[in-house]
């Protein structure tokens, strides 16, 4: 679950990670996720052209369940930037990149990522098809996890022997916008690289409500 609240016209308080992890994976159990929160600042916004640029930072507190591979380490700083533009009258391109920097690099891994999202409206209906491409590059190894396994976007395992490794995933999905303040979507994601980390494939459903 994520929560975002505007503090000013440009500055927002964001809670980007919390809630409960439900999994059928043989290597972990269901449990609570860590909590991450911080600030996001809008550097540029042009509503007429559909363009925006933002930067932000969060800190992840290791409060989650160990059985869900959460609650490890001494916390993680996340520094990021995101941008978006309207393409023509029916499409949007969004890009985000960031650095996940552990408070203790012996317990968690340093990760750089780059994510791209492209969507297109289907006719005049409030329905959008989209595709996403995500790249994770591991900048450090650690000694907290027994195996050289990458954790992707949800986990920071503190794995050994993964410095320089890359994980690339691709997702396709659909999103509906029945009202101006409501969005609902579903996506199927799978790894494209030989190294898969903890991901075989993943089905994600989301619901966004704006107040």
Label each residue range with its predicted role.
Residues 117-210:
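Outer membrane beta-barrel transmembrane domains
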Residues 1-5, 37-41, 57, 79-85, ...:
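Residues on the lipid-exposed face of transmembrane beta-strands in outer-membrane beta-barrel proteins
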Residues 17-23, 43, 59-65, 99-103, ...:
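Transmembrane beta-strands of outer-membrane beta-barrel pores
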Residues 1, 30-35, 51, 71-77, ...:
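Residues that define the transmembrane beta-barrel architecture of outer-membrane proteins
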Residues 28-76:
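Hydrophobic alpha-helical segments and helix pairs
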Residues 1-24, 30, 34-36, 108-113, ...:
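Glycine- and aromatic-enriched membrane insertion/assembly motifs of diderm outer-membrane
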Residues 10-15, 46-50, 89-94, 124-129, ...:
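Repeated loop/turn-to-beta-strand initiation elements of outer-membrane beta-barrel proteins
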Residues 72-155:
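Detector for outer-membrane/organellar transmembrane beta-barrel domains
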């Amino acid at each position: 679950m994520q929560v975002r609240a505007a503090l000013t016209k440009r500055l927002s308080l964001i809670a980007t990670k919390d809630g409960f992890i439900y999994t059928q994976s043989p290597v972990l159990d269901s449990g609570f996720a860590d909590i991450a929160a911080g600030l996001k600042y809008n550097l540029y916004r042009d509503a007429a052209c559909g363009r925006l640029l933002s930067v932000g930072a969060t800190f992840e507190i290791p409060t989650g369940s160990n059985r869900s591979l959460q609650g490890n380490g001494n916390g993680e700083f996340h520094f990021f930037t995101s941008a978006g533009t309207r393409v023509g009258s029916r499409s949007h391109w969004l890009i985000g990149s960031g650095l996940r920097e552990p408070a203790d690099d012996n317990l968690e891994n340093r990760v750089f990522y780059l994510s791209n999202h492209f969507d297109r409206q289907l006719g005049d209906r409030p329905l959008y098809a989209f595709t996403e491409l995500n790249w994770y590059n591991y900048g450090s190894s650690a000694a907290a996890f027994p195996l050289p396994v990458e954790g992707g976007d949800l986990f920071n395992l503190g794995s050994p022997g993964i410095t320089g490794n890359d994980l690339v995933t691709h997702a396709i999905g659909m999103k509906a916008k029945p009202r101006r303040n409501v969005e609902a979507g579903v996506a199927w994601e799978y790894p494209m690289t030989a190294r898969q980390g903890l991901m075989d494939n993943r089905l994600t459903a989301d619901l966004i409500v704006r107040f």
